[in-house]
Amino acid sequence: MKQFSFLSLKRQSRLTACILGLACFSTAYSKCPDDAVVDQYLAAYVKGISAIGFGPTLSDTDAECAKFKLAKQLPKHLGALSGYKLSSVSQTSRQTHGAEQPRWGFMFERNLIDIIAVIPANFGAYPLFDANLIVEIKDEGLAEASTPLEALQHLDSVMPFMELSDLMLSGPNTANELVATNLSFRGSIKSPEVPVQVTQHFADALSTFNVTMLDGNQDGQVLGSARGDVLMGHPLNAAIWLAKALKQAGIKLKPGDLLSLGSLIEPQKPRAGMKIKLRYQGLPDEPELEVEFSEAFDRGR
């Protein structure tokens, strides 16, 4: 199991500068959560215990403001900024949380690990894992792409990906409550890179590949499966949407940035002893990744 080194301080400064001035958004905030409320949530996040959160009545802009305040603090605990994640990609997910469109959050690199991992089952207050896909940015031109084939020109690689999220909040949550928590991001596991080929064949493979989630302790029981086109009709449509949203927010993508494109399979709750395998059939070399969830550890609560 490998843990990546920190990214440059320059990238961390880019995030901090954006947040300090709230320069990433031009909209005025009506009731941005107080710093003390954000600090209270962060203290619970670090301990891995449930939090009160920011309340169900947050407006879209107030939720974004809370997200940026929280993101300013998260590098102390999760390492440097590694990229951005997309959530509420499917219509079902948006209906569940009352979201009108996809939403995005920040990702950090300290808990970004490779291929095979052993993770404590209680890695968060309300831990979940899901099958996902990420792309690695080649240049900022992705925001100008209009088709999957055009998008490939601005990407270096794609990678199967398992996100480790932590809802932190008990009970049903609104879309804005989740946005304020940086969309529950806590960590992730990725497979080796699949180099991008700027061809229609490669673009088609990204749309038609099938991901299967298997439980190795249950004789390979299938926990879920999906095609790539569950992500906004094509995963690269999701990538383009996210790049445009980031540009609108004043964020310029850099080479090496990672974009998480949303859940392919409904998130699952980990249990101690689970051995999960994700198979991505139809992608070049049909990559896989594995994770074992170990016994819970004592957080000293």
Labelled PLM ranges:
Residues 2-16:
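Bacterial N-terminal signal peptides that target proteins for export
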Residues 16-24:
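Bacterial N-terminal signal peptides
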Residues 31-234, 287-292:
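Catalytic-core "active-site belt" of small-molecule-metabolizing enzymes
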Residues 249-251, 260:
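C-terminal soluble interaction/assembly domains
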Residues 265-268, 282-286:
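Short, charged beta-turn/beta-strand-edge "cap" motif at the junction between a beta-strand
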